[in-house]
Amino acid sequence: MSRLLTDFPMKKKRSDDARHIEGWQSKNERIESLLNVLYDFRFNTVKSRTEYRAASSSGLYQPVTKFVLNSFRRRLDATAGIVTSAENIRTILESDFARKVHPIREYFNALPLLNPTEHGHIGRLLNTVQVANPGKWEEYFTKWLIGVVANAMNDTGCQNHTCLVLTGDRQGQFKSWWLDNLCPTPLKNYLFTGKIDPQGKDILTLIAEYLFINIDDQLKELNKQNENALKNLITTPAVKYRRPYDVYIEEYPTLPASWLR
């Protein structure tokens, strides 16, 4: 006598709690466990990518590139016999497996609190530049510097509408060098120096990912259309675009303090 399939009770799926009590791990859980032993990971919300460094080290975080993903895949196979794809590893790393970090805010929050009137660091910095009007130089540089930090620490609105401009009669006066060195060493990955296209597609990535943009010797070359586009970029609070290899268009707050000379 034949029996219907419904006559056989379905085997119940074990709960996640039961699986962990029994010490059972999925393949991806084994991958995550081993990666955590070997490396430290974080998701850089400014660059919108995962970064890594050797576990328990104090070295700088490096971006997870295609080469690095393939190296992870190779090491998982050699160390634990885990065979997986680089794409699967990338999917794991671009999830809540890696903690989200805003490196620029992390840097500023870790700085010691100083009394500006007592220490006078801004004044000593200003004295390294010879200008025609020291009073205005101090006023606007201080306003610009405060705006740099305010813009980096807030996602909403644009807190810095001041653009720092250094001009000189001749080349070789170290204007670009001075501006570049305003960027702290730990934040050098967020400094761009060079020429930009105010109406090009790449500019959206620049103002979303870089805190400092040093536009080298470009002010006099801008036509009226590019000049207006640049003014708009400086005061834009956020940009919407699709990053390379992303699926969706997303909104990103703008970061940079643009410098021209």
Question: Model regions: which residues?
Answer:
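N-terminal nucleic-acid engagement/recognition segments and initiation subdomains in replication
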Residues: M1-T117, G135, E139
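Short secondary-structure junctions
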Residues: F41-K47, K188-Y190, P237-R243
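P-loop NTPase catalytic core of nucleic-acid-dependent motor ATPases
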Residues: S95-F212
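Short glycine/proline-enriched turns and hinge-like loops at secondary-structure junctions
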Residues: C158, N226, Y252-P253
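AAA+/SF3 P-loop NTPase mechanochemical coupling elements
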Residues: I203-A208, R243-R261
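Conserved AAA+/SF3 P-loop NTPase catalytic/coupling segment centered on the Walker-B
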Residues: L211-I234
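Conserved catalytic/switch belt of AAA+ P-loop NTPases
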Residues: E227-E250
